[in-house]
Amino acid sequence: MEELTRSLVNDVEVLNNHFVSTGHPLPSFDRHTPTVVLPNDASPDAHAARERILDNALRLFQLAAGPSAYLLNLQTGYQYASCVRWLCHFQIFHLVPLEGSIAYADLAVLAKAPEPQLISVVRMAMTNGLFLESPPQHLAHSATSALLRNDADFHDWAVTMSDLSFPTAFAMVEAHERWPNSVEGNQTAYNIAVGSELPFFSHLAEQSDRKRQFAGFMRSMARSQGTDVEKLAEGWDWAALGQACVVDVGGSTGHTSVALARKYPDLNFVVEDLPEVVAEGPGYLSYLDDAQDLKSRIGYRAHSFFDPQPVQDADVYMLRMILHNWSFDDCVRILSRLVQTLKPGARIIIVDIVLPDPGVVSASKERLLRVQDLIMQQVFNSMERYLENWMDIFRKVDERLEVKRIVEPPGSLMSLIELSMAA
């Protein structure tokens, strides 16, 4: 513990020195604190120090708690999850004013919720950084709760997580008892949790509110450190393409293409997804400040990636957080459709997790990777993949399909896998 503490003290000093030298505000629970603790353009040393702080603080907590307190502390996880669902359902994030505070009694009336239970829930949530009690018997926003109020996409993430992800995770035992070793997309923990026989995306398509919330969740993931598209923009030499066409395969409403288009004005994009998804793309673009420029360079096309690829002359086919949703055989089918259309010099860019072996990366990072792996199993009967899993897929698609390079940008949970066809 002493060694971890010394490292923690040293890294906190490194991070504080960075904040002082750059003028970036110090981390705080105060509502006016920036939601991003360390911007992507901060120095590599600062990012490394922050990563070590997260890891060492986590390990110190685990060591200080010890085995006998493991289950005691485990309770907090599912209760935090329950609180988020309660707070979303009763619209507490939006009923608490951004400035100042509101009395519990008044908030309970607005929320149509019982005051004693309201107090219990929010005081539990406070121990995890949501809300502040100031003054006594009054509720005010913290930096984190204000984010969930102000940012509709992050609120959609919270709703999707609490209403769908939580019950799905708890149905994993029943799914594996009922369908051991299944790779079918409609034999999952999700199917048990929601009582549907449809695969996830087919079931989602029947529910307009859930579909909208899921799109918001995907946009918020694209802006979250570790999974944000800025890492994609920085992790590959997009500028070297010059004037080029990029197909955003399964690109939803186009949030990834938007981020790349803003940084690389020579690139044009075709966002492909199912008809009901891309139909919402132009509306998403129209709300952006730079909509006019983006509309001239980002187009939408209804397309299933299991069908022959209609765009034959693209320079890059990009699949960001797509293949992890699908089984081995489906991944082979998806990539085979792209290989059939690759012109000489064209690339396939896969942006997905490449799982490390246990203990290779920090525990604070590894647990986020393992979470994603479990989610893929629970929702799709798929998986996050180790490098050897990826290589097996590529060899099955075409022996000529070459991995040119694999890059994991600093601070990212995901890697960029560049593929091309051998001459």
From Swiss-Prot:
InterPro entries: COMT-like, O_MeTrfase_dom, SAM-dependent_MTases_sf, WH-like_DNA-bd_sf, WH_DNA-bd_sf. GO terms for biological process: methylation; polyketide biosynthetic process. GO terms for molecular function: O-methyltransferase activity. S-adenosyl-L-methionine binds at D273. Induction: Expression is positively regulated by the cluster-specific transcription factor aoiH. Pathway: Secondary metabolite biosynthesis. Its EC number is 2.1.1.-. Gene3D superfamilies: Vaccinia Virus protein VP39, Winged helix-like DNA-binding domain superfamily/Winged helix DNA-binding domain. Keywords: Methyltransferase, S-adenosyl-L-methionine, Transferase. It holds the Pfam family Methyltransf_2. O-methyltransferase; part of the gene cluster that mediates the biosynthesis of a methylated derivative of known natural products orthosporin and diaporthin. Within the pathway, aoiF catalyzes the biotransformation of orthosporin to diaporthin but also of diaporthin to the final product, by performing a tandem methylation of the polyketide core. Belongs to the class I-like SAM-binding methyltransferase superfamily. Cation-independent O-methyltransferase family. This is O-methyltransferase aoiF. It comes from Aspergillus oryzae (strain ATCC 42149 / RIB 40) (Yellow koji mold).
